[in-house]
């Protein structure tokens, strides 16, 4: 069985996350976290940074591993590595997706995701309360 490594990023800004709607292919209209395939010689983090630059024209400032999912499709094993990521800017245009949506975790279930991305949504909901900015100590 052929293995394919894929990365995706949960871009967080202003207590919202970015999701993207597929514009082409068998899964047209489904939502996903932006990302793509890892190229030969690339680390997962390098691939994610490259994909965000290519697909969203933004530079990531921070990337932290969140979860790994394995999916089987058409005789292929797809390893999906998901990262929490941050950037100083927001994407201004759709390059490969039909639309980009900023949503709160409370409304993320309103969107039709790929099965593997649904697993990532669950993981995001588990860690979201920990992502609030810590209070400053008086000490």
Regions inferred by a protein language model and the residue ranges of each:
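Conserved hydrophobic "DFG−1" position in protein kinase catalytic cores
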Residues: 11-12, 19, 85, 102
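A short coil-to-beta-strand element that immediately follows conserved catalytic motifs
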Residues: 58-68
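Conserved N-terminal beta-strand and adjoining loop/helix that marks the start
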Residues: 1-17, 68
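A generic structural signal for short hydrophobic patches within well-formed alpha-helices
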Residues: 38, 108-109, 121
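Conserved Nudix-box catalytic region and its N-terminal flanking loop in Nudix hydrolases
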Residues: 13-54
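Charged phosphate-binding loop/patch that engages nucleotide di/tri-phosphates or the phosphate backbone
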Residues: 116-139
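Active-site-adjacent beta-strand/loop module that shapes the phosphate/pyrophosphate-binding cleft
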Residues: 69-92, 101, 105, 117, ...
């Amino acid at each position: 069985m052929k293995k394919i490594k894929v990365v995706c990023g949960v871009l967080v800004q202003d207590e919202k996350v970015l999701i993207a709607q597929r514009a082409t292919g068998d899964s047209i209209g489904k939502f996903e976290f932006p990302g793509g395939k890892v190229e030969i010689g690339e680390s997962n983090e390098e691939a994610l940074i490259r994909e965000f630059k290519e697909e969203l024209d933004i530079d990531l400032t921070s990337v932290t591993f969140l979860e790994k999912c394995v999916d089987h499709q058409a005789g292929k094993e797809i390893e999906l590595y998901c990262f929490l990521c941050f950037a100083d800017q927001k994407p201004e245009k759709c390059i490969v997706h039909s639309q980009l949506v900023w949503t709160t975790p409370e409304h993320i279930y309103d969107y039709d995701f790929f099965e593997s991305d649904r697993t990532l949504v669950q993981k995001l909901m588990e860690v979201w309360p920990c992502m609030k900015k810590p209070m400053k100590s008086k000490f």
